[in-house]
Amino acid sequence: MDKGGARRRFVREERDMADYADMHAFLMRELRLMHEPVGIRFFFEAEELEEFRGRGVHVEPVRPLTFCQAELGARMEGRVVLLDMKKLWCTDARCVFGVDAVSEGVVRDLLRFGTGEAQVRRFVESKPCMERAPLAVLLSPLRAQEGMPDVVHFCCDNMQAYHLVDDWMAVSGVHPFRPSLSINSAVCGGTAFSYLHTQANMTLACAGSYNSGKMERGEINVMIPGAHLEGMVSRMKERVEKTGGISLTRQGQPFPGADICQNCPVIVFKKPGERAGR
């Protein structure tokens, strides 16, 4: 047994976990996130999946769940959730992850989203679709990541999403930003798109993510490729160090998107004894 190799791998994973824990803490604190960022990793090889299972660091759904429901364990409860595709209940997610082909039943269920069967079929068949179906998907709080996730999902408000996407555009060089939203596939389809194209994505809640995914506060979904996360966070950290705050809308402000007009003469804060004009 290569004990040296195992030790090197352990040290690397330990370092990676520390790095992601730091990024997690920074994002939660500076962006004022309510939901934990979720690292998404797809397992395609049975050997790799069984090796992970054998470590016993995860939980699994007792009953079949939608992708959005399974993610709640990571996003709201801070748990490491392994979702086997055999327990993936949502037909839309099963299609975009390449587990099932588009069926007549799927089209019929979505007729309300179009003007007729032909149009809805075209809509469904044009959704992002992974060519190779994963065996399982791991959903973890970013702080618990061991190595780079495939995609990182943020459930956030308008201005938090604005900062994430703006900083992603800056580090990727992509502009304008063109998100991809598919009918009834906000989180699953949005994640598949980000994975397939190595591109950030932003989606509104669909019926499934709004109800099953508990997004009743009007949250917005942002997906960032795992390979781009470190550069994006580094840019944010540099801005905080240089200006004193993460805000892009009001430079130097600690709140992302402070709702105060720049020239407002009313909302001004000074130390006691300082004159307002100074």
Listing of model-derived features with the role each one plays in the protein:
Residues 10-16, 20-278:
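Acidic, serine/proline-rich low-complexity intrinsically disordered regions
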